[in-house]
Structure formats: structure tokens, C-alpha cells
Amino acid sequence: MDTKAFKRSLQHSENYNRKGFGHQAEVATQLQSEYQSNLIQEIRDRNYILQRGDVTIRLAQAFGFCWGVERAVAMAYETRQHFPTEHIWITNEIIHNPSVNQRMQEMEVEFIPIEGKNKDFSVVGTGDVVILPAFGASVQEMQILHDKGCKIVDTTCPWVSKVWNTVEKHKKIDYTSIIHGKYKHEETVATSSFAGKYLIVLNLQEAQYVADYIINGGNREEFLTKFAKACSAGFDPDRDLERVGIANQTTMLKDETEQIGKLFERTMLQKYSPIELNQHFQSFNTICDATQERQDAMLELVEHNLNLMVVIGGFNSSNTTQLQQIAFERRIPSYHIDTVERIKSGDSIEHRQLNGQLITTENWLPDGEIVVGITSGASTPDKVVEDVIEKIFAVKATAALV
């Protein structure tokens, strides 16, 4: 499929909208009431530090809702206001935050049901309204909805669209897109659908495996087994790694994406020559500004003398996991939670480890005076961060009375 031509056709359709419906002012008031926080603004005004009792909170200087998330959520609210009685569907979670997605359900925005491993688009009728989330949707899903005559509201983050444009450039010049990301993540599923030949690498270790194969060759069947779910149909590592371009899931660790890009640049230099490099390697900057800002702020925060970190965000949020990774690498006790309810009465907390396991830790708040670092993923409202901070203050104050 000529994905570029399809996008152009879709975007000129009268059933397509990616600019909203003119209800920004009304929606802004509603969003501020539901998601913003006076306490968080107070902490910002106090140089991102707040002390109460034995607890000092240090807040990262960039955290929470990014511009792309705010835009997506606002457009979803506008859509319901503009279509008060219509059936509204959404292809995936609008963002990776449980409280926001719960709010979507309360507004009667329904998820496309899944039958087996596939979405059942048969439930969507002609004239229904369908929201594409901030992560985007695959070109195949867009085509199904377009062919059905649905009203499509596209909230895809512009940074994600930028990555799509990059892999389309790779496809045009017959390069394989090496995508740094998680092959199951909605964003990477969408990005790969716009690519021609592609290979998805999770981390630097997998990238090194691919680089070694480019230089030395290897066991083709082992390679294809390793990346069976992370490559394009018919992928042949002996043929399709001669010319490669780098792209990324926008929420991955910036430093790792840069290292992967440099690794493949060095690999192609070694395999070919400096003169031939531009015929075998392409790299464009597709690192999201908001992701980079939050990671940089986290790197600055962990330089302080912290007793522990609390990282707030959806358990399926990739950018939140990357923030947790930074604390883990600094050996700071760190707790990834998605809602304030994970902090239990007494002194226990239910939290997600980097391996995905959900565990409960007792006595997680040390005795005496403590400094707690706080950050949140790009899909986390300030109101959720406020609730967590207030709960920490309350638990610590109760413990002091015992």
C-alpha cells in the first residue's frame, strides 16, 4: 500500500478531523477542574520543593501531561461535546493512564472489542465516530474505518506522526527501518504499519546482536526466531540489513536510542566505508522533546540526596517505565505506582517492578526526616500526583503519632 497517498486521501476526507471542533474554551475549563492541581502549582512556585512535617518532597522540574497528551485528551472531550448522542468508539486507550481512561468510559466512549487477538471492527457502524488515540493507529485500521464511512477524530501526537514520516522515507529509498521500541506497544504497531521492511529492537543488547550479524553473518534461522514477532513479513536478515535507517518509539530512553543509532552508524562504516556510508545508513532525530525533557529532569532529580523515589504513571506506560529505569540504575529505592490507592493504610505500598511484577513492600517509608523524589509519566494528570503526595504526608504523619 502507498501509505503516504492513503494518509493524504484520508486527511482530505470530510469525515476526518484532527483539529478539534471549536469547543476549546469550554473543554479547557473542564480539564482544569478534573486534572489540574493547586498544590502542584504551589510546589512549582516553591522551586519544586515542599516540606511538611518530616517529609520533604522534591518534584522533577518536568513531569506529567505533555503537550501531545493534553491535546489528545482535549480532543476526546471536544468530540463528546460535539457529538452528544452519537456512538463514539476509540481504537485503544486514549493515553496510558487508568484514571483518564476510566473517565473516557464514563463519557460513554467505548473501546473496540477484541475477539481472540484481533479487534472486531464489525461493531462499528457507518456514521459512528471513532477516536484514534495519542499513540496513533495502524494504517490498516485507518483504512477499515475510512471504508466504513466513519467520522474519524485523529488525536495522534505530532511527534508520532513525525516518526511515521521517517519510516516512509526509509521505504521510499528501499531502506529497512530499525525501530527502537516494544513490538507490542500501540505506537510501534502503528509506526511499523507505515514502514516497508522493518526490524524492531527492544534495547542496546538486541541492537548489538543485529550489528554483529551485519558484520559477521550468523545463524539465519536463529535470527528469525529471535525477532519472529518484531520484523516485517518475509524479512531476510541476509538481504534486508544492507541499507538501514533508524527510527524509534517516542517514549524510549533517549540515551539508548542515540547509542543504537551510533552503533549502526559504526557498523555500516565497518562493513562498507566512509564514502559509501550514506548509501547504507540513514538517521533522523525522532526523539520526542517531552520524553527527553522528562528524562533530563529525572536525571537531575536523582543527583539530589533522596531517600526514595515515587514514579507515577500507568503500568503500561513506556515513558514512565523509562523514568523508573533511571532511578533503578542509580540504586535509589523506587516505587512505580499508577494510582494513589497503591499506597495502603499503615506503611505498605503495592508497586510495579521493572520486570512487570506487581509486589507489595512493607515499611517503605523510612523513620525520621526523609526526602522523597516525585516524578510522573507524560500521561499522568497533576491531580493524581497531588493525591499521591498528600497520601505520603498523611501516612508519615500517622506513623509519627504511633
UniProtKB/Swiss-Prot annotation:
Record bears the keyword Lipoprotein: no
Active-site residue list: E187
Binding residues annotated for [4Fe-4S] cluster, in chain numbering: C66, C157, C288
Keywords: 4Fe-4S, Iron, Iron-sulfur, Isoprene biosynthesis, Metal-binding, Oxidoreductase
Residues where (2E)-4-hydroxy-3-methylbut-2-enyl diphosphate binds: H96, H185, T250, S317, S318, N319, S379
Catalytic activity: isopentenyl diphosphate + 2 oxidized [2Fe-2S]-[ferredoxin] + H2O = (2E)-4-hydroxy-3-methylbut-2-enyl diphosphate + 2 reduced [2Fe-2S]-[ferredoxin] + 2 H(+); dimethylallyl diphosphate + 2 oxidized [2Fe-2S]-[ferredoxin] + H2O = (2E)-4-hydroxy-3-methylbut-2-enyl diphosphate + 2 reduced [2Fe-2S]-[ferredoxin] + 2 H(+)
NCBIfam families in alphabetical order: ispH_lytB, PRK13371.1
Official protein name in the record: 4-hydroxy-3-methylbut-2-enyl diphosphate reductase
